[in-house]
Amino acid sequence: VVLTSNRTRELSDALRRRCLYLWIDYPSFEKELRIVLRKVPGISQLLAEQIAAFMHLVRRLDLQKVPGVAETLDWSLALLRLHRDHLDRTSVEETIGCLFKHHEDQRLVRGPWLDAALAAIHEAQRDGEGLARALSRIERTLKA
């Protein structure tokens, strides 16, 4: 038997004593990229990289509900069905409900952070730096 918890309410001590505990963190950029490429047939490498990078960065924000891999896949499918080949402000605005279920989270992402994050992602791809290597630099830039 496998029990899962999204931490919306605490499990009792008695139940915890009878269980083995395993914490599964959000995937790395590389792992999430592989998941998107495998689970979303037809998605381009470029868009999949941008999505994985965006998700990596958005999970660093102080959100009420951090989107998980299920939301990443829903969002990827929505973007693909809308025939998007790259992330831009319009694409994010039109599909933001796939990722964020709280208005406050949507408002936070729609602010100046969105333009800065997208610009940094596109710049890293243009420069050939590689998003995996660029993410820590981008994180520092967005915090400043």
Residue ranges of model-derived segments:
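C-terminal regulatory/interaction module of P-loop NTP-utilizing enzymes
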Residues: 1-144
